[in-house]
Regions:
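Small/polar/charged residue-enriched interaction surfaces, especially the RNA/DNA-contacting tracks
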Residues: 1-251
Length: 251
């Protein structure tokens, strides 16, 4: 990636197009020397050592995101965990990820309401999910078979593409319950706070038979978010310069 300290942006490169750029401008040997030495960054190499301009480099750039305060000129070799992107390099959130989050909220809701199963929950065996969700009895010989899960009645599409203007880099910071924080040499590409992301939710009532409706799912999500916040999030120090409170219900 190329970090522009003046613009506070990070540009991710198309590797093939980048090497084409080097070959076309007879910069391969110079790049080999750059790779052999310690330190340095691609921005300085491309624009100062090679003398390239933005128009020449642009074809090698896949996309560009805001680096905010996650990067600085002295620490430009941080690892970056990139966001999920499709074949056209558009950021999106898989529907399966959202369904997994909703599944957790619904399981929490079921545990709170159906206390007859509480004695079956322990640290070694975990939560007997089949007792709560595997109620369709389509494969009575194997209850753990996913075909029996009532979650089949909930379908969530992948999100619509997220504009790169709504993406940003965030610096990973570990926070302890005693208030101490420790910055890690790692950044993550994230969706900027306040961004609305759209999915299509389908509830197949031929399977659900009224067990879950949109309102009941939203109530379960809100209840689990409150539990998560009270039980865990409030025990830790707020992120530095955070614009949203920890534990906020993002769904």
């Amino acid at each position: 990636y190329v970090f522009n300290n003046r613009k506070q942006t990070v540009a991710f490169l198309n590797e093939q197009a980048f090497f084409d750029l080097l070959i076309q401008n007879d910069l391969v040997e110079l790049f080999e020397g750059y790779c052999m030495r310690q330190g340095g960054d691609l921005y300085t190499f491309l624009y100062k050592e090679c003398g390239l301009n933005a128009a020449q480099v642009k074809p090698a750039i896949l996309y560009e995101v805001d680096a905010s305060n996650a990067m600085d000129a002295e620490h430009t070799l941080k690892d970056i965990d990139c966001f999920m992107r499709d074949a056209k390099q558009r950021a999106y959130i898989p529907g399966s990820s959202v369904k997994g989050a909703i599944r957790t909220a619904l399981l929490f809701d079921a545990i709170q309401k159906e206390r007859t199963h509480h004695d079956l929950i322990d640290d070694k065996r975990g939560i007997p999910e089949a007792d709560y969700f595997h109620t369709l009895n389509l494969n009575p010989k194997k209850r753990d078979d996913a075909v029996n899960s009532i979650m089949r009645g909930i379908q969530i599409s992948d999100s619509l593409p997220i504009d790169d203007r709504n993406m940003m880099l965030t610096l990973k910071t570990d926070s302890a319950v005693n208030g101490q924080t420790h910055a890690i040499n790692l950044c993550r590409e994230c969706v900027a706070p306040g961004t609305r992301i759209r999915f299509a939710l389908t509830l197949d009532q031929s399977i659900l038979k009224g067990k879950w409706m949109v309102n009941s799912i939203l109530e379960a999500i809100a209840a689990f978010a409150d539990y998560q916040n009270q039980t865990y999030a409030t025990r830790f120090t707020q992120p530095r310069e955070s614009v949203q409170s920890a534990g906020r219900n993002l769904l």
